[in-house]
Amino acid sequence: MVQYTQETYLYDPSVLLKLDFHRSPAKFQPFISAANPGETWLQVRPLKDTDYDRGFLQLLSQLTHVGNVTRTQFLTRFSQMKASGDYYVTVIEDTRKGEIIGAASLIIERKFIHNCSVRGRLEDVVVNDTYRGKQLGKLIVVTVSLLAEQLGCYKMSLDCKDKLIKFYETLGYVLVPGNSNSMTIRYDEDASALKRNTTSTAVTGDACQTNSQFYNFFSPFCY
C-alpha cells in the first residue's frame, strides 16, 4: 500500500463522536456505536483522500458497477465533494489490514421548504461479505442517520430492495405510501430529537401538517 505523509478527511471526524446511539430505535446486541464499533481494530470515520488504496472502490463494486476509476479521477471527485460540503461518505476500516470494509453515503439536499431546511439521502450502503454478522450494516446506517439529524435534516430518505425493507424498518424507517420501495425517517422540526415513525397511514388533505403532534406522520404532499 502507498505510504502517505498527509491525509485529508471528507468532513470533520469529530462530529461522529457527538452522535448519541441510545436515541436510535435500532437494537444492538451487544451495544456498539461509531465511537465503539465492537472491535478495537474497527474504526468508523469519514472517507479519506487516501482510501483509494484501502479498497474503497473495490468495496463499492460489491454493491454496483464502479468501472475502472483511476486515482486521478478518485481524487478529483473527492475534492469536488469536499468543496461542496454536502457529501458525508462514511466508512468502516479494518485497521489491521488497512482495508475499508463498510460504507454509506449521506447526501444533503438544500430546500426552500421547511424554512429553507435540508433533507438527507442515504445511498451506497455496503458491508464486505466476509464481515457480515457483526452488526456493521446496522452500525453504518444508524451512524449516517444520526449524522443527518445532527446536521439539521428534517428527514432522511432512501430506496431499497424488497428484501431489505424489514431491516430498515428496525432502524426507524417507514415505507412511503404509493412510492415503490422508497423509505423515510423524519426528525423533529427543529432537528433536536430522533423519532421513530410509528404509523404507516398517510395524512390526507391538501396541505402538510407540520405541527409537532403530527410531524412524524408522512403526507404524500410533503417532500
Cite the ranges covered by each PLM segment:
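Conserved beta-strand in the GNAT
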Residues: V91, E99-I108, V126
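Glycine-rich phosphate/pyrophosphate-binding loop shared by adenosine-nucleotide-utilizing enzymes
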Residues: L42, K97-A103, G120
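Conserved catalytic-core motifs of GNAT/GCN5-like acyltransferases
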Residues: I108-K111, S157-D159, K163, E169, ...
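A short helix-loop-beta-strand connector motif used in the catalytic cores of GNAT acetyltransferases and
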Residues: S79-V91, R121
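A conserved beta-turn-beta hairpin within the catalytic core of GNAT-like acetyltransferases
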Residues: E99, R110-L122, R132, N179
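Short amphipathic alpha-helix that is part of the acyltransferase structural core
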Residues: D20-T76, L194-A202, D206-N216, C222
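Conserved GNAT acetyl-CoA-binding A-motif
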Residues: V141, A148-K161
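Conserved acetyl-CoA-binding loop-helix of GNAT-fold acetyltransferases
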Residues: D124-V127, G133-L146, T170
